């Protein structure tokens, strides 16, 4: 049948279709010729769009309408495409066969598809381009063959495709460019050969593709290019050679006079020669970052009048800023990761249209005046070596909106450095060496970063930044001026209270509130609430203040304040009294008294640390934000934290030693054994002190730091090193308490009933037991706090944590001496002995100053001697049990060098 007959038949069929469609079908009616399970809709009045995608079909539907203009058979299981099955679809313009299992397409499969414009065959199992099936599809404009396994392209497979504009051959297994197959595609405009295995591009590989505009060759294995491989591509505007193995600069691009966008980043190119782009005057964008570039010709980027974007990242061997003469239209310049140490003074004369300047990760030390770059909108100079910002550096940059100077060594900024930047909204000066910050001209800022400048401790008034939305400061105290932590705390508390109520309760509460208040009260209430919300949401400042970074009061509550003052006063006074009675008494100091005296001395240090914190709270009362950063970073906070940890650990270690000493002493006394010499005990005491000193020094060496909070204590939460340090302390101290408990349990179990009361110094045994019990009870909250932070248990409120750290932790330092003063009879005896000794010393001193006769002198001397003998005789005691039948194990004489511990009844 000839062509004229075919056209007549088609016209007749169209007329019959129109007659059959005499009345419009309803919106839900299924058009005629629609296969079952497929979705069909009209395309105009005659043509039909058929969607049979993702139905699990294994073959083509047989009852397709001849007026089908769109057929989607993608995502099925079709493995064969019979010849001539689609030949009736002469109106078909788009055929989708993607995502099937096609391995071969026979000749004649697309015969009769004279109107076909789009053919999609991607995501199949094709191993070569169909040799004859695609020929003579004269209307075909777009062909997708990507994501197959194609390794061979027959030379004549594309013959007759005179209208083909777009060809996808990416994500296949091609090893070479199919030069012969492309010779018939003179109308081709865009082609991608990306994601293949191409190693080399031969000369004239695209010689006949004179209309090609876009060519993608990225993600191949290309390591070399023919010197004339791009000859013939007279219309090429975009060339993508990214992610290949190129070792040399692609000099073949010199013939691409219309090239506008060039990408060859992520290769192995080590140098860019002089006048590298001399044949590409139309270049607008160049991307060649992530190459190990060691050399860039000074004139490489000259005379590119259309160049808009230049990006060079990771060129670590570039030390000189490139000359950009004749590239005056450059708008974006990115040269990062190099070793550029200076900029030419005339950089803005060469780049008057520059809008984005990114020179981050270089070695810039000084900056020229950039006032000539009037169009600059963004400057990124982070991670350089800049020390000073001069007044002329950024002058009159009226369009500058973003300035990043983070991670430099900036210590000096001219007071007017930012005074002529009216459009600046983002400024980043984080991680520098600033001690002051100029605010002139920054009233339009919305984002400000100053974090990492530890020397910048002064408060910055919020009135200088009326438009500010986000700010990052070196310390939380500087955020107190931007929002007020009191408002945040008040609103959050109110919301927390309401969280526990049901919706009905809240409605009732609101209704009652409105009924009780008159209009004036309601307006005042709403105004206050709006002010609170404004204060809460106006500025997002970080790090935000909180219970451990307070704005007004260090201690927060009066309960903590009174507790700290009470602890400090009692610890200082009572421990001083105990130490005085122990070390200043004329009597011999026994081993247990030595331990009690040393414990009193270290508890004085704990009292000193609490007293210093109390003094800081009093000095900064109501205005702690002004002094918080100074206090945290100062030596005073380090000393307070060191003394606190040292005193706490020393007290526990010495108490453990006292418990062991009592057990050993009772054992020796019951067996009439000689006790260990006092020298050995002193050595062990020194060892305990050195161990506590080592533990207290660890935070000073790094990791867990004392200045993490104004409380000057390693908090049991936050950084893992801090948590680990606190947990290690808890485990060590728990071990000490366990040893003490075992020692005393063994001691009591080894004694028969009533035997303890007969011991010569049972009051000291009971006293150490009382200290053990009290200290163990007080340490339980500390241990629980540390382990709860380790387990991420967050139900403990900050006020409770502060109370434990500030009151419970130092409480043993005042409780230990109080227990000794109130309950231990040795204290009364020591006080009496100290009083007698003091009175005797005063009388002796008074007598030496008077001039009296010899009789009076002899009389007074005799009385004094009698008093001394009487006193010494009354104070003699022995380190052996006072049993009637036992004789001393060694000779004893009443000498001042003998052990002198008074016998005291066991209470």
UniProtKB/Swiss-Prot annotation:
One of its GO terms (molecular function) is protein-hormone receptor activity. Expressed in the intestinal epithelium (at protein level). Expressed in the gonads, the adrenal gland, and in the brain. In the central nervous system expression is restricted to the olfactory bulb. In the adrenal gland detected only in the neural-crest derived chromaffin cells of the medulla, but not in the cells of the adrenal cortex. In the gonads, the expression is high in Graafian follicle, but absent from primary and secondary follicles. In the intestine, exclusively expressed in cycling crypt base columnar cells. Residues 22-561, 615-638, 704-723, 789-802 are extracellular. Disruption phenotype: Mice exhibit malformation of the tongue and of lower jam causing newborns to swallow air leading to 100% neonatal lethality. Conditional knockout of both Lgr4 and Lgr5 in the gut results in Wnt signaling inhibition and results in the rapid demise of intestinal crypts. Simultaneous knockdown of LGR4, LGR5 and LGR6 results in developmental phenotypes, such as cleft palate and ankyloglossia, but not in tetra-amelia with lung agenesis. LRR repeats lie at residues 67-88, 91-112, 115-136, 139-160, 163-184, 187-208, 211-232, 235-256, 258-279, 282-303, 306-325, 329-350, 353-374, 375-396, 399-420, 423-446. It holds the Pfam family LRR_8. GO terms for cellular component: plasma membrane; trans-Golgi network membrane. CDD domains: 7tmA_LGR5. It is a multi-pass membrane protein. Its main location: membrane. Disulfide bonds join 34-40, 38-52, 348-373, 479-541, 637-712. The keyword Disulfide bond applies. Residues 1-21 form the signal peptide. Residues 583-593, 660-682, 745-767, 824-907 are cytoplasmic. Residues 25-66 form the LRRNT domain. It is found in: Cell membrane; Golgi apparatus, trans-Golgi network membrane. Gene3D superfamilies: Rhodopsin 7-helix transmembrane proteins, Ribonuclease Inhibitor. The keyword Signal applies. Belongs to the G-protein coupled receptor 1 family. Identified in a complex composed of RNF43, LGR5 and RSPO1. Also interacts with other R-spondin ligands, including RSPO2, RSPO3 and RSPO4. LGR5 is used as a marker of adult tissue stem cells in the intestine, stomach, hair follicle, and mammary epithelium. PANTHER family: G-PROTEIN COUPLED RECEPTORS FAMILY 1 PROFILE DOMAIN-CONTAINING PROTEIN, GLYCOPROTEIN HORMONE RECEPTOR. This is Leucine-rich repeat-containing G-protein coupled receptor 5.
């Amino acid at each position: 049948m000839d062509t004229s007959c075919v056209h007549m038949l088609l016209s007749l069929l169209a007329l019959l279709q129109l007659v059959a469609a005499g009345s419009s079908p309803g919106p839900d009616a299924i058009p005629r010729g629609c296969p079952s399970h497929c979705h069909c809709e009209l395309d105009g009045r005659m043509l039909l769009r058929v969607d049979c995608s993702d139905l699990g079909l294994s073959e083509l539907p047989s009852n397709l309408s001849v007026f089908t203009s769109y057929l989607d058979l993608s995502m099925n299981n079709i493995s064969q495409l019979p010849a001539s099955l689609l030949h009736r679809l002469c109106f078909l313009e788009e055929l989708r066969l993607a995502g099937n299992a096609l391995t071969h397409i026979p000749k004649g499969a697309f015969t009769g598809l004279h109107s076909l414009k789009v053919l999609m065959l991607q995501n199949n199992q094709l191993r070569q381009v169909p040799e004859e099936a695609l020929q003579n599809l004269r209307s075909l404009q777009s062909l997708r063959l990507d994501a197959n396994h194609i390794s061979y392209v027959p030379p004549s497979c594309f013959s007759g495709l005179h209208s083909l504009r777009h060809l996808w051959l990416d994500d296949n297994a091609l090893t070479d460019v199919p030069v012969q197959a492309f010779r018939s595609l003179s109308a081709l405009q865009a082609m991608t050969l990306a994601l293949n295995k191409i190693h080399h591009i031969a000369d004239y590989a695209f010689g006949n593709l004179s209309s090609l505009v876009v060519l993608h060759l990225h993600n191949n294995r290309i390591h070399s290019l023919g010197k004339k491989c791009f000859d013939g591509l007279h219309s090429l505007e975009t060339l993508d050679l990214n992610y290949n193995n190129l070792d040399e600069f692609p000099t073949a691009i010199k013939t691409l006079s219309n090239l506008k966008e060039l990408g060859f980043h992520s290769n192995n190119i080590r140098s860019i020669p002089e006048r590298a782009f001399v044949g590409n005057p139309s270049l607008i964008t160049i991307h060649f970052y992530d190459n190990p570039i060691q050399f860039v010709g000074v004139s490489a980027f000259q005379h590119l009048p259309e160049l808009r974007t230049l990006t060079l990242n990771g060129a670590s061997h570039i030390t000189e800023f490139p000359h950009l003469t004749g590239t005056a239209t450059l708008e974006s310049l990115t040269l990062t990761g190099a070793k550029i140490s200076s900029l030419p003074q005339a950089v803005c004369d060469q780049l008057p249209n520059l809008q984005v300047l990114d020179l981050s990760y270089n070695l810039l030390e000084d900056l020229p005046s950039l006032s000539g770059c009037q169009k600059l909108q963004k400057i990124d100079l982070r991670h350089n070596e800049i020390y000073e910002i001069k007044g002329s550096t950024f002058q009159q940059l009226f369009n500058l909106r973003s300035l990043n100077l983070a991670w430099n060594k900036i210590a000096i900024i001219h007071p007017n450095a930012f005074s002529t930047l009216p459009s600046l909204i983002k400024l980043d000066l984080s991680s520098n060496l600033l001690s002051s910050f100029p605010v002139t001209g920054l009233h339009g800022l919305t984002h400000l970063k100053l974090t990492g400048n530890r020397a910048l401790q002064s408060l910055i008034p919020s009135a200088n930044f009326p438009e500010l939305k986000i700010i990052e400061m070196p310390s939380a105290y500087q955020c107190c001026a931007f929002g007020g932590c009191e408002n945040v705390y008040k609103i959050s508390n109110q919301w927390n209270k309401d969280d526990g109520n049901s919706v009905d309760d809240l409605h009732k509460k609101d209704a009652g509130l409105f009924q009780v208040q008159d209009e004036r009260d309601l307006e005042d209430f709403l105004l206050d609430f709006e002010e609170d919300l404004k204060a809460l949401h106006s500025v997002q400042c970080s790090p935000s203040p909180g219970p451990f970074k307070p704005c007004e009061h260090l201690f927060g509550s009066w309960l903590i304040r009174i507790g700290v003052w009470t602890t400090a006063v009692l610890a200082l006074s009572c421990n001083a009294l105990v130490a005085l009675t122990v070390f200043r008494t004329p009597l011999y100091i026994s081993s247990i008294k030595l331990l009690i005296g040393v414990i009193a001395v270290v508890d004085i240090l704990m009292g000193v640390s609490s007293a210093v914190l109390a003094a800081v709270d009093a000095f900064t009362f109501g205005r702690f934000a002004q002094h918080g950063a100074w206090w945290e970073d100062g030596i005073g906070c380090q000393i307070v934290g060191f003394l606190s940890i040292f005193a706490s650990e020393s007290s526990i270690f010495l108490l453990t030693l006292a418990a062991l000493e009592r057990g050993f002493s009772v054992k020796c006394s019951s067996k009439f054994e000689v006790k260990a010499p006092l020298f050995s005990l002193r050595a062990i005491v020194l060892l305990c002190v050195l161990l506590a000193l080592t533990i207290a020094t660890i935070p000073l060496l790094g990791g867990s730091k004392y200045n993490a909070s104004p409380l000057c204590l390693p908090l049991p939460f936050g950084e893992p090193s801090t948590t680990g340090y606190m947990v290690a302390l808890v485990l060590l101290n728990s071990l000490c308490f366990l040893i003490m408990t075992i020692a005393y349990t063994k001691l009591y179990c080894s004694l028969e009933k009533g035997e303890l009361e007969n011991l010569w110094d049972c009051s000291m045994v009971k006293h150490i037991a009382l200290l053990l019990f009290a200290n163990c009870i007080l340490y339980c909250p500390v241990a629980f706090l540390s382990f709860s932070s380790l387990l991420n248990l967050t139900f403990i409120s900050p006020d409770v944590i502060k109370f434990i750290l500030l009151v419970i932790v130092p409480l043993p330092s005042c409780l230990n001496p109080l227990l000794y003063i109130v309950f231990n009879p040795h204290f009364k005896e020591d006080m009496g002995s100290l009083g007698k000794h003091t009175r005797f010393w005063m009388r002796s001193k008074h007598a030496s100053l008077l001039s009296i006769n010899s009789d009076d002198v002899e009389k007074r001397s005799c009385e004094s001697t009698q008093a001394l003998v009487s006193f010494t005789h009354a104070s003699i005691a022995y380190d052996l049990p006072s049993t009637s039948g036992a004789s001393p194990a060694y000779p004893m004489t009443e000498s001042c060098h003998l052990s002198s511990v008074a016998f005291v009844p066991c209470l």
